[in-house]
Regions:
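N-terminal accessory/pre-domain segments preceding catalytic cores
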Residues: 72-170
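Hydrophobic/aromatic-rich core segments of domains that either
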Residues: 3-68
Length: 170
């Protein structure tokens, strides 16, 4: 297909005060022209939607959100986003190649461990053409450019929103 994919494991840094475990899959894509790109399926928060150049100092603005790539001694390659007038760390990864089996333990931790943020409440996100919609616990938000709409859902409303917005039928 004209490109090679290498998988890495990242430490999600946004909002962390301690060094977090590696638990996020990141792809590095090398194209036929030797250009390298960082590719990510995303998370439920603001995250880059299109590949970032895999080069120190690279910067890209996507749908009004600006990201850049820096190198740090401990974290390796760090993706940062411009937020409230300052660069905010998003995640960091080193270039240690990962295999599918390397994701089993972090995936299990995310799904089952009592300290995992994913075991505490509903956590869904879907990208839209102009933003994203999220369900975090009972809080439903849609981000459309600079506009955010928010609604606290009742437990009875959640199945309908999961179906109509996220395509999940309970």
């Amino acid at each position: 297909m004209g490109y090679d994919v290498t998988e890495y494991m990242a430490r999600y840094l946004r909002g962390e005060t301690d060094i977090p475990m590696r638990r996020h899959r990141v792809l590095a894509v090398t194209c036929a022209d030797s250009s390298r790109w960082i590719v990510d399926a995303g998370i439920g928060q603001a995250a880059f939607r299109r590949p970032l150049p895999f080069a120190e100092g690279a910067e890209r603005t996507i749908n009004g959100e600006t990201y850049h790539v820096v190198k740090k001694d401990f974290y390796g390659w760090v993706i940062e986003d411009w937020h409230n007038g300052a660069w905010r760390p998003f995640y960091g990864f080193t270039e240690e190649v990962q295999l599918n089996l390397d994701y089993i333990m972090p995936s299990f931790w995310c799904e089952k461990h009592p300290d995992s943020p994913f075991t505490k409440a509903n956590m869904l996100s879907i990208k839209t053409d102009t933003g994203r919609c999220t369900l975090d616990g009972n809080t439903f938000r849609c981000f459309d450019g600079d506009t955010v709409t928010e609604k606290e859902l009742t437990d009875e409303e959640i199945p309908s929103v999961m179906d109509s917005v996220f395509g999940i039928r309970l």
